[in-house]
Amino acid sequence: MNKQAEPILLGVIGGSGFYDLPGFDIVESVNPITPWGYPASPISIARTTSGFLIAFLARHGVGHIYTPTEVPSRANIAALKSLGVLAIVSFSAVGSLREDIPPEDFVLPTQIIDRTLCARPNTFFESGCVAHVSFGDPFDQDLYEILSSCGSNLKNGSKLHTKRKGDDLTVVCMEGPAFSTRAESNLYRSWGASIINMSVIPEAKLAREAEIAYQMVCMATDYDCWRMNEEPVTVETVMEHISNNKDNAKIFLLEAVKKLEAPLLQGFLGRNLRESVQNGIQTNHKHRNPDAIRRLQFLFPNLTIPH
């Protein structure tokens, strides 16, 4: 497949329990090497009945071999960018911090609190080439609006939670791999957070740096550990709900792809991000590290190396 002749505009990242792309015709598997290594899994290329192409990768690798800290997020995002991806729909299991978000409900978050403690590489811009991206609204607004219209046909009574007027849905990203203490869980609730996971950072930051529209679709599996009358969350608790969540993720994604195809083909999604980062590099051109620029050229081929 020639990526320039046939770009793949939509990327999908699967989280815990979501390791393949059911319901789609897989036509190819690719494993592009990036300056930041290989992605967590080979990327499956699927084609819809209309001919629209989708790229799918498993965040934690085939067989779930990477902890949240170990996920090669830079390679994941860079590999999708190299295929032509303009928008990413990312799925993740989350714990609920609110009574009205029960297990197996879906959430489209609007804000992020980063509690990853700087343990993960979270930028493409380093070692002699500095850029600062705008991250006040960490998810793409246009992509959010389209995905907000999906999910009305989820099974088992599950529903999609989206932003109400003046009410952000905030996801806390913790380091892991251990779950929260009860004190931490209640602290996050006091901050007004809605859900908690271990994956949205640095994924969302890197997508923004790569000028890719990004939205995470969160699938609740538990109430974390803030409910004092319940046992704290365990892997067994999470796995009980992951199977149903995967079935609903397929339903959600099938609907989302249909609604995203036209906006992507028409150049609507991500239009505000194009060249926003590469034109905002702060390092003076003549002082840019050539090795750093060579890495960044994988994302932005038009960047030039200083002479």
UniProtKB/Swiss-Prot annotation:
The keyword Transferase applies. The record marks 180, 235 as: Important for substrate specificity. GO terms for molecular function: S-methyl-5-thioadenosine phosphorylase activity. Its EC number is 2.4.2.28. PROSITE patterns: PNP_MTAP_2 (PS01240). InterPro entries: MTAP (IPR010044), Nucleoside_phosphorylase_d (IPR000845), Nucleoside_phosphorylase_sf (IPR035994), Purine_phosphorylase-2_CS (IPR018099). Gene3D superfamilies: Nucleoside phosphorylase domain (3.40.50.1580). Substrate binds at residues 198, 222-224. It catalyses: S-methyl-5'-thioadenosine + phosphate = 5-(methylsulfanyl)-alpha-D-ribose 1-phosphate + adenine. It is an enzyme of class 2 (transferase). GO terms for biological process: L-methionine salvage from methylthioadenosine; purine ribonucleoside salvage. Pathway: Amino-acid biosynthesis; L-methionine biosynthesis via salvage pathway; S-methyl-5-thio-alpha-D-ribose 1-phosphate from S-methyl-5'-thioadenosine (phosphorylase route): step 1/1. It is found in: Cytoplasm; Nucleus. One of its GO terms (cellular component) is nucleus. Keywords: Cytoplasm, Glycosyltransferase, Nucleus, Purine salvage, Transferase. Phosphate binds at residues 16, 59-60, 92-93, 199. Homotrimer. Catalyzes the reversible phosphorylation of S-methyl-5'-thioadenosine (MTA) to adenine and 5-methylthioribose-1-phosphate. Involved in the breakdown of MTA, a major by-product of polyamine biosynthesis. Responsible for the first step in the methionine salvage pathway after MTA has been generated from S-adenosylmethionine. Has broad substrate specificity with 6-aminopurine nucleosides as preferred substrates. Belongs to the PNP/MTAP phosphorylase family. MTAP subfamily. This is S-methyl-5'-thioadenosine phosphorylase. It comes from Schizosaccharomyces pombe (strain 972 / ATCC 24843).
